[in-house]
């Protein structure tokens, strides 16, 4: 009889505010003996920090597995990074232990979980996803404004490095993970008459959160951090 393998869960923890964790996320974090989380080059594990703020001492005694992901556009470098992370997770799954990989925002939106999910599923490991609150929804709530109007109003979501034509699409535009490009973006918004009414939320729900409700009145002078979300609404 084949040994049962553990399940690899992608668990969304939201953008920063621990109150935005879903009941499902809390249950899975409690249930899984192993918690995997991305670790930045500076050693920060933001997704784990959010879970710890929500569950506190309940995480004591769990195995914490830091995952290092390369920040590169080189496909070979990225592939090696993903394979190394999958290799770190695999022994726990082989031992029959469930692993919860904690992801900022929602696990289905520009999340590193998807890379490992594909690799591990191809090897026969079971996987599952727990939905959460994406950063742009939390940013809209923080600004106290809806993302869309009527049912016919389109919504465009684009990550950093988008094509400039995105700004010409109708409806609301959500520009994510674009902190280093903010000065150039502000110039383009001003030139197209879209700066007034556009908003920026940096590090939504985190201790260093910054909110700019109207970029025509107030905006940062230089680049911002990675977790910057710009809402352009017409």
Language-model segment annotations:
Residues 42-44, 72, 134-138, 206-208:
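Short gly/pro/ser/thr-enriched loop/turn and capping motifs at secondary-structure boundaries
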Residues 37, 63-68, 129, 149, ...:
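Structural signal for conserved beta-strand scaffold positions within catalytic alpha/beta enzyme cores
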Residues 8, 99, 167-234:
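A contiguous loop/helix-start segment that scaffolds small-molecule binding in enzyme catalytic cores
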Residues 105-169, 221:
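Class I SAM-dependent methyltransferase SAM-binding "motif I" and its flanking Rossmann-like core
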Residues 1-19, 23-126, 220, 225-229, ...:
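Class I S-adenosyl-L-methionine
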Residues 20-24, 86-87, 142-144, 159-163, ...:
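A generic local structural motif
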Residues 77-85, 142-145, 169-172, 211-217:
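Short, surface-exposed amphipathic charged segments that create phosphate/polyanion-binding patches used
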């Amino acid at each position: 009889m084949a040994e049962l393998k553990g399940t690899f869960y992608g668990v969304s923890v939201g953008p920063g505010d621990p109150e935005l964790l879903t009941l499902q996320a809390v249950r899975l974090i409690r249930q899984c003996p192993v918690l995997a989380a991305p670790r930045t080059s500076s050693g920060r594990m933001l997704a784990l920090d959010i879970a710890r703020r929500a569950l506190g001492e309940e995480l004591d005694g769990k195995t914490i597995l830091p995952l290092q992901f390369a920040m590169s556009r080189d496909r070979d470098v990225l592939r090696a990074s993903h394979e190394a992370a999958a290799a770190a997770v695999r022994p726990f799954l082989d031992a029959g232990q469930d692993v919860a990989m904690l992801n900022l925002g929602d696990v289905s939106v520009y999340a590193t979980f998807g890379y490992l999910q594909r690799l591990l599923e191809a090897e026969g490991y079971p996987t599952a996803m727990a939905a959460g609150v994406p950063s742009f929804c939390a940013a809209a709530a923080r600004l106290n404004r809806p993302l869309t109007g009527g049912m016919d109003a389109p919504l465009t979501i684009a990550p950093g490095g988008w094509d400039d034509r995105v700004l010409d699409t109708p409806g609301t535009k959500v520009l994510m993970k674009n902190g280093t490009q903010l000065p150039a973006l502000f110039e383009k918004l001003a030139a197209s008459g879209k700066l007034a009414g556009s908003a920026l939320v940096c590090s939504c729900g985190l201790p260093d959160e910054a909110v700019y409700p109207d970029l025509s009145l107030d905006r940062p002078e230089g680049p911002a951090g990675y977790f910057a979300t710009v809402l352009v609404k017409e």
